[in-house]
Amino acid sequence: MTTGECCHLPGSLCDCTGNAALSKTVEEADNRRAQYVTQVTAKDGRLLSTVIKALGTQSDRPICRICHEGQDVCNSEGLLSPCDCTGTLGTVHKSCLEKWLSSSNTSYCELCHTEFTIERRPRPLTEWLRDPGPRNEKRTLFCDMVCFLFITPLAAISGWLCLRGAQDHLHFNSRLEAVGLIALTIALFTIYVLWTLVSFRYHCQLYSEWRRTNQKVRLLIPDTKGAHSTQHSLLSTKLLKKTADETIV
């Protein structure tokens, strides 16, 4: 970058007359990052002010359209182009796409509607027991489990006592009391079985819905598709760099 002989600081007033001309040059810094240099000079060529702005290199690289990050160097996870989208929307991380397909419960691109080759695996029951979903479903599951653990032994003991009392009444020829205790036992077990079946069916429906919408998705990419993705990523990088160079010039 060339400097003039004007001793004024940038931003200060100058007694030089004439219209100011604008010239732009490009320099290479020590860290090899492009810098955008704007020089404001007077009509006689003396430098009035200089504005230097380093250009970021992130825009020159393809990024993931989901997380908006570039290639993950730490995990060695590159960018893929598994669908027909082009430009900045054509590259994506495999892990990001798998999480998106799992959360959205779809198997195609929402932009170009390309069907992905995926493998779905249901999550285990223990994971649903730890996190069944919304707060009201958690509370319902917890209450039903506590009631089941409390009512089951209580119903068993009550039924055994009623049957034992009915047997004693039959032994002493008190048939009316015996029939009443037997009817009470049948009613008790009927209510217990109906409540258990209704609660079990309700939670089975919740688990089936959770299992259907919360699956582990694994993206299957053929080798030919992977090679095409690499070429597409390299081509996108070259095009973006070429566009950036033309913009700077």
Swiss-Prot record:
User: RING-CH-type zinc finger positions in the chain?
Assistant: 56-119
Q: Which GO terms describe its biological process?
A: endocytosis; hemopoiesis; protein ubiquitination
Which key words are in the record?
A: Cell membrane, Cytoplasm, Endocytosis, Endoplasmic reticulum, Endosome, Golgi apparatus, Lysosome, Membrane, Metal-binding, Transferase, Transmembrane, Transmembrane helix, Ubl conjugation pathway, Zinc, Zinc-finger
Pfam families in the record, alphabetically?
RINGv (PF12906)
Instruction: List residues binding Zn(2+) 1.
Output: C64, C67, H93, C96
Looking up PROSITE patterns in the UniProt record yields: ZF_RING_CH (PS51292)
Residue numbers binding Zn(2+) 2: C83, C85, C109, C112
Membrane topology according to the record = Multi-pass membrane protein
Q: Which GO terms describe its molecular function?
A: ubiquitin protein ligase activity; ubiquitin-protein transferase activity; zinc ion binding
- Report the GO terms under cellular component: cytoplasmic vesicle; endoplasmic reticulum; endoplasmic reticulum membrane; endosome membrane; Golgi membrane; lysosomal membrane; plasma membrane
Where in the cell? Endoplasmic reticulum membrane; Lysosome membrane; Endosome membrane; Golgi apparatus membrane
Its biological purpose is as follows: E3 ubiquitin-protein ligase which may be involved in endosomal trafficking. E3 ubiquitin ligases accept ubiquitin from an E2 ubiquitin-conjugating enzyme in the form of a thioester and then directly transfer the ubiquitin to targeted substrates.
User: Any idea what this protein is called?
Assistant: E3 ubiquitin-protein ligase MARCHF2
Native species? Danio rerio
Q: What is the lineage of its organism?
A: Eukaryota, Metazoa, Chordata, Craniata, Vertebrata
